[in-house]
């Protein structure tokens, strides 16, 4: 599976979560954090997709995706440990941990694989 197939929906999920946090609690921090990280992930996913279309891998996109997911895992994991609340901290920490593992796997295996050219 290609990284951008998960990265773009992951970014949209973070934006949506930040928006919901803002609407329910009036939290500008939730909105800014969700929108900021979500938009960066969508941008990284888009860069990766465009590189894939050229049969290349984007190291910058892979590193950016990994760093953001790892940072969210740490920040939201700490928040979960302090509050014990599954929503949103535990959920975001869990999803981000899975995404971090996925990105590390993609980096370790050489990035996106390209389909063989049919003759």
Curated annotation (Swiss-Prot):
Pfam short name (any one): Tmemb_14
Membrane-crossing residue ranges in chain numbering: 27-47, 57-77, 84-104
GO CC terms in record: cytoplasm; endomembrane system; membrane; nucleus
Membrane topology designation: Multi-pass membrane protein
Main location: membrane
Keywords: Membrane, Transmembrane, Transmembrane helix
Entry-linked Gene3D superfamilies: Transmembrane protein 14-like (1.10.10.1740)
InterPro entries: TMEM14, TMEM14_sf
Subcellular location(s) per record: Membrane
Miscellaneous comment in the UniProt entry for this protein: For all TMEM14 proteins, 4 hydrophobic alpha-helical domains are predicted. However, NMR structure determination of the human TMEM14A showed that only 3 of these helices are membrane-spaning while the amphiphilic N-terminal helix is probably located at the lipid micelle-water interface.
Family, as annotated: Belongs to the TMEM14 family.
Job of this protein: May be involved in free fatty acids export.
Designated name of the protein: Protein FATTY ACID EXPORT 6
Organism: Arabidopsis thaliana
């Amino acid at each position: 599976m290609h990284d951008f197939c998960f990265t773009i929906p992951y970014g949209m999920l973070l934006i949506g979560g930040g928006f919901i946090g803002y609407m329910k609690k009036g939290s500008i921090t939730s909105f800014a954090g969700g929108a900021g990280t979500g938009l960066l992930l969508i941008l990284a996913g888009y860069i990766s997709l465009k590189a894939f279309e050229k049969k290349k891998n984007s190291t910058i996109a892979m590193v950016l995706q990994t760093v953001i997911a790892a940072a969210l895992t740490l920040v939201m994991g700490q928040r979960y440990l302090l509050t014990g609340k599954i929503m949103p901290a535990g959920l975001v920490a869990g999803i981000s941990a899975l995404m971090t593992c996925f990105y590390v796997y993609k980096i370790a295996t050489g990035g996106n694989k390209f389909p063989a050219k049919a003759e």
